[in-house]
Curated annotation (Swiss-Prot):
<dbReference type="InterPro" id="IPR011032">
    <property type="entry name" value="GroES-like_sf"/>
</dbReference>
<dbReference type="InterPro" id="IPR020843">
    <property type="entry name" value="PKS_ER"/>
</dbReference>
<dbReference type="InterPro" id="IPR036291">
    <property type="entry name" value="NAD(P)-bd_dom_sf"/>
</dbReference>
<dbReference type="Pfam" id="PF00107">
    <property type="entry name" value="ADH_zinc_N"/>
</dbReference>
<dbReference type="InterPro" id="IPR013154">
    <property type="entry name" value="ADH-like_N"/>
</dbReference>
<dbReference type="InterPro" id="IPR047122">
    <property type="entry name" value="Trans-enoyl_RdTase-like"/>
</dbReference>
<comment type="similarity">
    <text>Belongs to the YCR102c/YLR460c/YNL134c family.</text>
</comment>
<dbReference type="GO" id="GO:0016651">
    <property type="term" value="F:oxidoreductase activity, acting on NAD(P)H"/>
</dbReference>
<dbReference type="InterPro" id="IPR013149">
    <property type="entry name" value="ADH-like_C"/>
</dbReference>
<protein>
    <recommendedName>
        <fullName>Uncharacterized protein YLR460C</fullName>
    </recommendedName>
</protein>
<dbReference type="Pfam" id="PF08240">
    <property type="entry name" value="ADH_N"/>
</dbReference>
Length: 376
């Protein structure tokens, strides 16, 4: 089946330090193993505005990492038994990359790598609502929230913390609790669900606003501490001085210091950071030999070096293998309704709403929800 594809498209690109909607952008070329989708829904992430503000993305490059749509063209080496024109898929794209600046999620057409793509067995449609509560992943608005957040969460638990991909085992895989700082973030909500379903830890402790407590406990969180409390770290340490597994889902200088203080006093502890924060970012007087900081970089799953600002991220074949294995494992669970998308706020003016979405994320107007633009 052939689908008519235009020569150019509308996309959101970096121009003069801003996200700008432009016409006449060339359709991205397809590398080996990629497919072209007609983009139907996209979601914003903090990394999108960071690529602009921190000058990570090149001028003119297409922004966006979360895309969902319908396949219109198969690239080289794509098995038509696995992916066909007309299939509905969703996946992670490194938008505004130095290596592939002509491809990003925030465009009418996007190229997605099939080895790290999620696939829906059914036709996906728009629900048409302004707001969606957390629920089964069965709409275009819902699937657009999944790729970055869920894939990151899966890698944190399996690649960084070493959990096995076992669904609802009878006993916890680790003998201690896990602390998730930023439990209501998109990655945090995914982590709670996965940590619960994989029975990874004896307890799932989250730090988030009290207003999110009901939902986070529905996902599987055991206990919530409110980050608004001035003594939140002291509260946690008073009750739990043995936390060996910690994830900083907010990932800034302040939260790193707080999470670090929550780590176990004596036994070895691992903190997973979602940004490039290391021991060097911890105040010298607080550093301890028993605490290790590990970093998860979703950009490393592409199978090649990634120029990223003033550094180059090395190719990480093990992270790539872990991502492929996780997606293959979790995709049927999503299709069965065993993983829920987080609450969604929908923007209905297509790509024209993307600059607004990025500002809303940058200034913290997305508490506990994912911001999605639909392209009708």
């Amino acid at each position: 089946m052939q689908v008519a594809i235009p020569e150019t498209m509308k996309a959101v690109v970096i121009e003069d330090g801003k996200a700008v909607v432009k016409e006449g952008i060339p359709i991205p070329e397809l590398e080996e193993g990629f497919v072209l989708i007609k983009t139907l829904a996209v979601a914003g992430n903090p990394t999108d505005w960071a690529h602009i503000d921190y000058k990570i993305g090149p001028q003119g490059s297409i922004l966006g990492c979360d895309a969902a749509g319908q396949i219109v063209k198969l690239g080289p080496a794509v098995n038509p038994k696995d992916f066909s024109i007309g299939d509905y898929i969703y996946g992670f794209i490194h938008g505004s990359s130095v290596r592939f600046p002509s491809n990003g999620a925030f465009a009418e057409y996007s190229a997605i790598s099939t080895v790290v793509a999620y696939k829906s067995p059914n036709e996906l449609k728009f629900l048409g609502e302004d707001v969606l509560p957390a629920g089964p992943v069965r709409s275009l608005e819902g699937v657009a929230t999944i790729p970055v957040s869920l894939t990151t969460a899966g890698l944190v638990l399996t690649y960084n913390l070493g959990l096995d991909l076992k669904w609802e085992p009878s006993t916890p895989q680790r003998k201690g609790p896990i602390l998730l700082w930023g439990g209501a973030t998109a990655v945090g909500q995914s982590l709670i669900q996965l940590a619960n379903k994989l029975n990874g830890f004896t307890k799932i402790i989250v730090v988030a606003s009290r207003k999110h407590e009901k939902l986070l406990k529905e996902y599987g969180a055991d206990e919530l501490f409110d980050y608004h409390d001035i003594d939140v770290v002291e509260q946690i340490k008073h009750k739990y001085n043995n936390i060996s597994y910690l994830v900083d889902c907010v990932a800034n200088q302040d939260t790193l210091q707080q999470v670090y203080k929550c780590a176990a006093d004596k036994q070895d502890a691992t903190i997973v950071e979602l940004k490039n924060l290391t021991e060097e970012n911890v105040k010298k007087e607080n550093r301890r030999q028993n605490v290790t900081i590990d970093i998860i970089r979703l950009y490393s799953i592409g199978g090649h070096e990634v120029p990223f600002g003033n550094i180059t991220l090395p190719a990480d074949s093990e992270a790539r293998k872990a991502a492929i294995k996780f997606i293959k494992f979790i995709n049927p669970k999503i299709n069965d309704g065993q993983i829920r998308h987080i609450p969604v706020r929908v923007y209905k003016n297509g790509l024209c709403d993307v600059p607004h979405i990025l500002k809303d994320i940058k200034y913290g107007k997305n508490s506990g929800e994912k911001l999605v633009a639909v392209l009708n």
